[in-house]
Amino acid sequence: MYYFLTASKDTTIFSQQAVQNTGLDEILEVSKVYYGNLKDTARSLVKFDLNTLPSKLSSGAVTMSEAQIVIRETQPSEIALAYSLHIHPISQSWEMGIGTRFDNISTDGCTWNYRASGSK
């Protein structure tokens, strides 16, 4: 049996745009770009609401011994033949924000420097 959880919020944060947010962008980015002296790192944050999972497990509606995250690439470019993605839990809350990558970058929500608008 499969039980699917979809993300309740997501955003990409960029080291070179350290106070800008792209929470409404349709693309999540994970990258390192080197151009001369410029180094731009992109990280994606994804939140899954797990609040209903304990009741589903205790009722028997969901039985599981493992969980998987499936990530799909769309139109990747310049990716090495072998690479690894490292996934880490986030220990504090963060805000998604309403920015998009190039058209509507905003300073609300999570950024490289802040987990919510202006708060570290």
Whereabouts are the PLM-identified features?
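Beta-strand-rich interaction/scaffold domains
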Residues: P76-K120
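A short beta-strand-loop element at or near the start of a globular domain
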Residues: M1-T6, T11-E78
